[in-house]
């Protein structure tokens, strides 16, 4: 039975063009999600292509296995539960070194956002969780109910780029004195009272929820740790492809690629001087592609 893991992968054609899969090539999808990119890469790498798929969410791996099995490609993929911060260890244990391409599709899947029980969304009430890996670490409720007012304000400002961070943190602390936060709708309502109505299409809780998700999953730290490992695992000529969804991620990727392309012994050449965006047609059918930015670099030594 196929797991209900609904996720539309972004920029599939652009990813395949960037990775340029070849028959017999070996690839790593460090954020395999529902397997949409993995399927396209393996189809382009026939015959003989192999892929290592990694994801922190066990449900994503089940969905990917089902998707690849339906296409007759399951035996060409190794699927591992884990964090891409441990990329080198996972790749070493599975024999995926000197690979031809590595993909990072950052952010949260449609399934995670649209499943209230995962606690990522302010649009539907659910437990205040937000863990990409539901078996690991503190939840968003843990952070909201235990961090000091200053720590909360710092998280919301730094990771959410929310200018009302101090006022939001103050309101959270005042409210939790009498009743701890447990539900997403409860937190969203408190934020909305502080910030006010929608900012155009943006819900007033958007930036705070993003900040908490990043903090819960240590997303930026793990990305910064994973990128050097990825370069080390690439064979000369191998491609590093990264899709980011907000400025904090994109800044880390941009600065990393630039640093690796400069200096006395550069290891990368940058293929995308400016990030590639989704086409208007794709955004029309998949609005979550609107903020996607794709960057590509090639290993040269």
Curated annotation (Swiss-Prot):
One MF annotation (Gene Ontology) recorded for this entry: rRNA (cytosine-N4-)-methyltransferase activity
GO cellular component: cytoplasm
Group of enzyme by EC: transferase
The keyword rRNA processing is annotated on this UniProt entry: yes
Binding site for S-adenosyl-L-methionine: 35-37, 55, 84, 105, 112
Catalytic activity line of the entry: cytidine(1402) in 16S rRNA + S-adenosyl-L-methionine = N(4)-methylcytidine(1402) in 16S rRNA + S-adenosyl-L-homocysteine + H(+)
Location in the cell: Cytoplasm
UniProtKB keywords: Cytoplasm, Methyltransferase, rRNA processing, S-adenosyl-L-methionine, Transferase
Pfam families assigned to the protein according to its UniProt record, in alphabetical order: Methyltransf_5
Entry annotated with the keyword Nucleotide-binding: no
Record EC number: 2.1.1.199
InterPro entries: RsmH, SAM-dep_MeTrfase_MraW_recog, SAM-dependent_MTases_sf
GO biological process, one term: rRNA base methylation
Protein's job: Specifically methylates the N4 position of cytidine in position 1402 (C1402) of 16S rRNA.
Family: Belongs to the methyltransferase superfamily. RsmH family.
Protein name: Ribosomal RNA small subunit methyltransferase H
Source species of the chain: Chloroflexus aggregans (strain MD-66 / DSM 9485)
């Amino acid at each position: 039975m196929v797991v209900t893991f609904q996720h539309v992968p972004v920029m599939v054609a652009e990813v395949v063009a960037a990775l340029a899969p070849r028959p017999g090539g070996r690839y790593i999808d460090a954020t395999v999600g529902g397997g949409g990119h993995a399927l396209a890469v393996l189809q382009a790498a026939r015959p003989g292509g192999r892929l290592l798929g990694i994801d922190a969410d066990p449900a994503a791996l089940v969905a990917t296995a089902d998707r690849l099995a339906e296409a007759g490609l399951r035996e060409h993929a190794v699927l591992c539960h884990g964090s891409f911060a441990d990329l080198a260890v996972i790749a070493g244990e599975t024999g995926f070194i000197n690979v031809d391409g590595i993909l990072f599709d950052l952010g949260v899947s449609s399934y995670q956002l649209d499943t209230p029980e995962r606690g990522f969304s302010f649009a539907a009430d659910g437990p205040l969780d937000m863990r990409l890996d539901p078996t690991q670490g503190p939840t968003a409720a843990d952070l909201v109910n235990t961090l000091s007012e200053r720590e909360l304000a710092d998280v919301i400002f730094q990771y959410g780029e929310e200018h009302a961070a101090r006022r939001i943190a103050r309101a959270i602390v005042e409210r939790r004195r009498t009743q701890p936060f447990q539900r997403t709708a409860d937190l969203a309502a408190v934020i909305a009272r502080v910030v006010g109505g929608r900012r155009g299409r943006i819900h007033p809780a958007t930036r705070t929820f993003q900040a908490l998700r990043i903090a819960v999953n240590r997303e930026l730290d793990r990305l910064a740790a994973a990128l050097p490992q990825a370069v080390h695992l690439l064979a000369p000529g191998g491609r590093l492809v990264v899709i980011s969804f907000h400025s904090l991620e994109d800044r880390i990727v941009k600065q990393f690629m630039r640093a690796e392309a400069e200096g006395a012994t550069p290891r990368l050449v940058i293929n995308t001087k400016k990030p590639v965006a989704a086409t208007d047609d794709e955004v029309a059918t998949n609005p979550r592609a609107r903020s996607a930015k794709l960057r590509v670099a090639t290993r040269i030594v």
